[in-house]
């Protein structure tokens, strides 16, 4: 792989104000990882971005939590089709939100089906987030809560489990299921199952002061296109860690992606790899993310015109992308404009991390698309 094209496009992006700094990593077909870092850690932090700069990766957490859950399934400690409520009493009797009465109070009914781990890992449980569901947001506001205080177990379903696809807190709840199955915190369980074996020493739910000293600053995109520093998101509560709580580096995250595209890296079992790479939603389809909190996220319509499905943990493109990933590749993203793909057919993967809101910033998405094409061209 020739480094210069990727380095040049990242340098140009920073010069154009896409981000104060960008960091990226590429997994090559031979398994080597190439790293890139350009610019500064933040608009108010002149320290240079480098491969050791750490990022809040938000929903990039989901694939790792999913892989750990599938490993526990392979070891007989979890069951994809067991009702989650047997281990998590908060979902023992799930309810479906049918609307709101004249006074604005939620109208709920008992769900006819139980929520399963299969539902949680494929976003077919009926659970949403507040930022992409006006109904969930209204429910929380009526209760005087936010997602952080309610957690994944404090939400109603929007539909019967398995009925359709909706991006939500399912994998956050799966993190609680991992804790129930192992008797350990999610961080301890992931360290044992994933981080330790893969040498991911820069990935954590609980950053220390020394770790935070290497952290990239978080920013908000202003109406004039400029970026303004904002406060870092504090560590998420346990209910929401499995879907969005990790901090990491592109290099560390690439170690996980390398295991996904290179046969498990001696860590992920064949059964886990099969689950991560097989679409589970072809009957119900995969929807778009329509934001109701524009300060957090724009609408997200990945790969328009491309046939897609959702595996356990990943979005999967059923068609090849021109100049980029092969059919059957896997991808997702994190709220502060962190993006990645993993191409098992080519043994290639890439991660590009920024730290800005709202999510799905078209400027960063344009760079990510160019980054992917540059990787395959070189």
For the regions a language model picked out, list residue spans one by one.
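Short, surface-exposed loop or secondary-structure junction motifs
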Residues: 35, 86-324
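Short, well-ordered beta-strand elements
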Residues: 36, 339-341, 347-356
């Amino acid at each position: 792989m020739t480094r210069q094209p990727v380095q040049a496009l990242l340098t140009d992006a920073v010069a154009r104000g896409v981000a104060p700094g960008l960091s990226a990593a590429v997994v090559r077909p031979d398994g080597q990882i190439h790293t890139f870092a350009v610019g500064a850690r933040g608009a108010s932090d002149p320290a240079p971005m480098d491969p050791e700069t750490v990022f809040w990766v938000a929903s990039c957490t989901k694939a790792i939590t999913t892989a750990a859950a599938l490993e526990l399934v392979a070891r007989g400690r979890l069951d994809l089709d067991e009702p989650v409520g047997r281990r998590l009493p908060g979902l023992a009797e799930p309810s479906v939100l049918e609307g709101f009465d004249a006074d604005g109070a939620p109208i709920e009914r008992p769900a006819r089906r139980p929520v399963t781990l299969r539902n949680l890992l494929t976003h077919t449980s009926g659970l949403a987030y507040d930022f992409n569901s006006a109904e969930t947001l209204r429910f929380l506001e009526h209760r005087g809560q936010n997602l952080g205080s309610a957690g994944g177990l404090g939400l109603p379903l929007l539909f019967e489990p398995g009925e359709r696809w909706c991006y939500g807190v399912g994998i956050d709840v799966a993190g609680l299921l991992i804790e129930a199955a192992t008797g350990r915190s999610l961080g301890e369980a992931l360290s044992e199952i994933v981080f330790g074996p893969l040498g991911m020493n820069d990935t954590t739910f609980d950053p220390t002061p020394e770790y935070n000293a290497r952290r990239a600053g978080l920013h908000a995109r202003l109406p004039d296109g400029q970026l303004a520093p904002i406060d870092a998101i504090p560590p998420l509560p346990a209910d929401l860690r499995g879907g969005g709580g990790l901090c990491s580096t592109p290099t560390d995250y690439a170690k996980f992606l390398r295991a996904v595209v290179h046969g498990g890296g001696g860590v992920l079992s064949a059964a886990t790899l099969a689950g991560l790479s097989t679409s589970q939603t072809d009957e119900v389809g995969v929807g778009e993310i329509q934001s109701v909190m524009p300060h957090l996220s724009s609408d997200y319509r990945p790969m328009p015109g491309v046939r897609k499905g959702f595996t356990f943990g990943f979005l999967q493109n059923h068609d090849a992308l021109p100049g980029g990933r092969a059919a059957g590749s896997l991808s997702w993203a994190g709220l502060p404009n962190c993006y990645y793909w993993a191409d098992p057919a080519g043994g290639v993967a890439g991660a590009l991390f920024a730290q800005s809101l709202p999510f799905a910033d078209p400027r960063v998405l344009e760079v990510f698309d160019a980054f992917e094409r540059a990787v395959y061209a070189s």
